Amino acid sequence: MKTFTCQCNHTIHFTNTKCIACNAILGFIPEDLQLTALTITNEGLYKVATNDNLYKQCKNYWHHDVCNWMVPHDDPNDLCQSCRLNVTIPNLEKPENLNLWYRMETSKRALLFTLFKLNLPVISRLVEPKTGLGFSFLEDQIEDEYGNELTVKNYVVTGHSAGLITLNLNEALDSTRIEMREKMNERYRTLIGHFRHESGHYYWDRLIKNSSLIEPFRKLFGDERLSYTQSLEQYYQNGPADNWQNVWISAYASMHPWEDWAETWAHYLHMVDTLETANNYEISI
C-alpha cells in the first residue's frame, strides 16, 4: 500500500485517522483516492484542507471507529462507499468481534482501493440487489461448549455467490487462520488474500460470463462447465495435479477453471499492490 502526505508534510498511512505530527483529523476521499487532512466546520462537517469540498464521516468512522472513509456532505447515505457494501456485519454484542470486524474492514478497503485504481466496476447490492457486490462477515454457530472444546453447529464457509462474498470471521483471528493455512497447505492464506480471491469470482461473473471473452477464457483456463462439485471432491480426496507447479499459479488453482481464474486474479492484485508499494518507496528491481 502506498503512503500519503499530510498538510504538514508528515507521512500518513492508509488506515490512519489522525496525523501524529500535527494532530490533524484524517479522512480518505474515495473519489480522489487520497487520504487527507480535514478541518471541522461550525456545522460539524469536514472540509478538505486543500479545497472547499465538504464531507461527513462514515457512520462506521464516528460510531464504531472501524473506518476512516468520508462521505460527501449531501449524500443521503450515512455509510461510505466501502461500508455500504456490507450485507451482514458481526454481532457487536460480543466485545471481541469489534477488533475482528476492524481487520475485515481494513482488508476490504485495501481491496477497494486497488479496484478503484484499476477502474473496475464496483456495483453495490443497493443498485443491483441480486448480483451486486456485497460482503457478509459471519461467525460459526456454536452449539455447545465442553471445557476448551467447542461443538460447531453451523460452519461458515468463505466463498462467493452471485456477487455476495461471505467471509468467516475467524479468518480475522491470526491463530485460527495460520492453523488453517498449515492444514490446507495454502501459502497465501491471508485476510487480504481472501478478499482478492473472492473478488475474482465476482469479476468473472461481471466481466467474463456470457461475454465475448468466454471462449478465450476457456482456451486459457479450461472449460468452467466441468462439474465444480466433482472437481472439489476430487481435489480434497486426491490432492492437486502432480504437475501443478508447471501449469498453475497455486495448487488450489488446479482444482477447477473458476479457481484457476480466481487464484490468478488474486496473485495479479498481489503483484499490483506490491509494485505500487515498491514504487512509493523508490525501490527498483
Question: Where do the model's predicted regions map?
Answer:
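Metalloprotease/metallohydrolase-associated module, dominated by Zn2+-dependent proteases
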Residues: 2-7, 11-17, 35-38, 48-81, ...
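Short Cys/His-rich micro-motifs in 6-15 aa windows
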Residues: 23-33, 82-91
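Fold-level signature of zinc-dependent metallopeptidase catalytic domains
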Residues: 88-89, 93-104
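Hydrophobic (often cysteine-bearing) scaffold residues that line and stabilize catalytic clefts
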Residues: 103, 107, 188, 192, ...
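Auxiliary, metal-adjacent structural segments of Zn-dependent hydrolase domains
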Residues: 103-174
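Short, glycine/acidic-rich hinge or "gate" loops at secondary-structure transitions
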Residues: 126-128, 212-223
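Short pre-active-site segment immediately N-terminal to the catalytic Zn-binding motif
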Residues: 174-195
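Catalytic Zn2+-binding segment of zinc metalloproteases
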Residues: 199-216
